[in-house]
Every structure is written in C-alpha cells, then in structure tokens.
Amino acid sequence: MLYLIGLGLSYKSDITVRGLEAVKNCTRVYLEHYTSILMAASKEELEEFYGKEVILADRELVESGSADILRDADKENVAFLVVGDPFGATTHTDLVLRAKKDKIPVEVIHNASVMNAVGSCGLQLYNFGQTISMVFFTDSWRPDSWYDKVMENRKIGLHTLVLLDIKVKEQSLENMARGRLIYEPPRYMSIAQCCQQLLEIEELRAEKAYTADTPVVGISRLGSPTQSFKAGTIKELAEYDAGEPLHSLVILGRQSHELELEYLLEFTDNKEKFKNDVIADQEYFKPAPWVPPVEEED
C-alpha cells in the first residue's frame, strides 16, 4: 500500500491520528522536500516523533526516481509525507497515477493546507478564484501566464491566492551544464519580491489587471506560532519586511464583503487609507453597466 499523508502546516503533531497510525505501520517513510517545508519541525524531530527513519524526497527523486519510492509497495506499506495536503501539487497526483498503473493500492489521508487555512486572514474561501504560483524571475525567464488568471479572477470579483516560489536543493545553470552535483542554498520568495514582480509584469503587459494601489494581504508563516498578516497595497507591500518564510499573498477581488474588510482592517497601519484603497480599487475595476440588446423591429 502507498499512503499519501498530509502533515498540515507547521507542527509535527499536526498530522492526523489516522495519518500517524499509518506512518507507524509503514516499512519506508518518505518526506517530500521541495514544494514546501514543515516550519516548526525538523527531519530529526519527525523521526523521533514517528519512531521511524524519514527519507527526504527531493524533486529529482519524486519526478525521476518514483520507481524507488514505489518499490515493493505492492507487498509492504510505504508512506509519502506531504506538507499541507497530499494533492497540493500535481507531482503528487502523478505519483498516484504511477502507483495505480503498477497495480499498487493507494490511500490518501488529508490535512490542512494553505488552500483552506488562508481563510484565517479574514477573506471568505468561497470568494477565491484560481490560485497562481509566482516563481523567481531570472535574467532570461520572466513567465507571466499567471497574469491572465488574475485578470479573470478580478473580472468576476474573486480574490487570488498567490503561492510563492521556494528553491530547495536546486543547481545553478553553470553547475548543471558542467554536470557538477553542487546545490545552491535554499531560497524562499518574500512578499516584497512577489509584489515587485507583480508590478513589473503589470508595467510590461499594461492590461490593467491590477494597479500599484490594488489592495493585497501578505501572509507569513501560516499555521505556525509566529503567523502574521499584513494588509496594504501592492506598492506598499513591495517594501514590506515579512520576516522568516514561508510567505504567500492574496490579491483582493473587486467585490470584497464588508465583513472581510472589517477583519482586514486589523492588519493594516492606516485603517482609513486601506478602506479608501479598497473602494477606489472596486470602482477602478468595475465592469461597464449591462445594456440590454436592442430588439429588432419586425
């Protein structure tokens, strides 16, 4: 049996009772270690808590060496641990498909993730649209396909959750080209860098999906003891120091509910200004009034 087990957001004890029982019954335990990190627990602490050795599964192992993970899973129990919920990344869906192709039974044990815990910032979950990912820009690569999704969300008044890039056990282009197994230090995108990249792409595309004054909410270390939120404009949060990772961001939709706004005011330095920014943004992105079609005369 292959178990895909969600670990939750932060603590070693965030795993569910059913998930913990499954881990204890597994021969091998893998921890996916490149789409997210467990902020309040180390590998060693997890091993002590589970009473099991934990094998770190980097991108290369999961995407290219899945046969190693699935080895003998038709005869013994193998656990694949994922920070958050198991289906927070398409890679994990692919692992399930490979297991099923090999006739290996699969059981998924869910947990909290940023996709639902984001509601703790005060925005209502059913007012969210498509989620986007913001990657680190390079000199030669500045992807902007996410921009269209932000535009679509904003047109129908929905908030956009932005997941920020992390780089764990990544190689530089030079080391890859030379075949050197030398890895760069871990990097975690900050709220400020995300906002700077948002502004850069809006300037480039100039389609007015948002402006520098569009309200956003910065989320830091969600689910951890030092969880914090910051509400302001994209321009303001482009200079905001949110502290230690992990970070994420929400771009407000143009139809923010009054209860959402009241909640967000607790996270801003200037309540009156933020209120006015929200009102101005809603007017800025207000669609043209609907005009009924002219009926043709007989």
Curated annotation (Swiss-Prot):
Its main location: cytoplasm. Keywords: Cytoplasm, Methyltransferase, S-adenosyl-L-methionine, Transferase. S-adenosyl-L-methionine-dependent methyltransferase that catalyzes four methylations of the modified target histidine residue in translation elongation factor 2 (EF-2), to form an intermediate called diphthine methyl ester. The four successive methylation reactions represent the second step of diphthamide biosynthesis. Belongs to the diphthine synthase family. Its EC number is 2.1.1.314. This is Diphthine methyl ester synthase. Pathway: Protein modification; peptidyl-diphthamide biosynthesis. GO terms for cellular component: cytoplasm. It is found in: Cytoplasm. It catalyses: 2-[(3S)-amino-3-carboxypropyl]-L-histidyl-[translation elongation factor 2] + 4 S-adenosyl-L-methionine = diphthine methyl ester-[translation elongation factor 2] + 4 S-adenosyl-L-homocysteine + 3 H(+). GO terms for biological process: methylation; protein histidyl modification to diphthamide. The gene is DPH5. Pfam families: TP_methylase. SUPFAM superfamilies: Tetrapyrrole methylase (SSF53790). It comes from the Eukaryota. S-adenosyl-L-methionine binds at L9, D85, G88, S113, V114, L164, L222, H247. Transmembrane segments: none annotated. InterPro entries: 4pyrrol_Mease, 4pyrrol_Methylase_sf, 4pyrrole_Mease_sub1, 4pyrrole_Mease_sub2, Dphthn_synthase. It is an enzyme of class 2 (transferase). GO terms for molecular function: diphthine methyl ester synthase activity.
